[in-house]
């Protein structure tokens, strides 16, 4: 049986570990880097598999983390980018259909993991460009020695709250 619970609450470093503890698979559908790092770190610390995804305009990406089987989000991206280094979804815009495409791929990753079939995107970053209709599957190296959360000598032992700007309802508009 599958049970989906939703929560209308702010998630931060003080409550995320308790929130995810009882779940078999976590899906990251957040719209900002600090939240993505928070989810990654909590999932690594709690040994929880999860699917990361991100979209902006006509592009999307996703990867799946399974404890002990491949790199985590922080292995690949290290730290949140400096403020204003990357446009927010409010600034750049998000095409609603992209959420459907990438979200469906995340749902498929969860289903495959939960029923134990197929190949997951563990160790890979899948990118999609809707303008060219091209997918690319990029092999990711695992930074086992230097990753601050899943490496040989982790320095992050608890989730971290980073300053973040959340996109508003008007994020999909182009002015």
Task: Report residues per predicted region.
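Adenine nucleotide-associated cytosolic modules
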Residues: 1-175
């Amino acid at each position: 049986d599958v049970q989906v619970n939703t929560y209308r609450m702010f998630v931060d470093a003080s409550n995320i570990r308790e929130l995810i503890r009882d779940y078999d698979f976590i899906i990251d559908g957040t719209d900002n880097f600090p939240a993505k790092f928070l989810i990654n770190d909590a999932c690594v610390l709690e040994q929880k598999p999860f699917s990361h995804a991100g979209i902006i305009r006509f592009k999307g990406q996703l990867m799946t983390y399974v404890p002990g089987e491949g790199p985590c989000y922080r292995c690949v991206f290290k730290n949140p980018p400096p403020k204003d280094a990357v446009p927010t979804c409010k600034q750049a815009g998000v095409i609603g259909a992209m959420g459907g495409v990438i979200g469906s791929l995340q749902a498929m990753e969860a289903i495959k993991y939960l029923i134990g079939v197929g190949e997951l995107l563990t160790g890979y970053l899948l990118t999609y460009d809707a303008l060219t209709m091209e997918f690319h599957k990029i092999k990711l190296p695992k930074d086992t020695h230097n990753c601050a959360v899943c490496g040989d000598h982790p320095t992050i032992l608890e989730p971290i709250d980073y300053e973040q700007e959340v996109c508003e309802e008007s994020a999909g508009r182009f002015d």
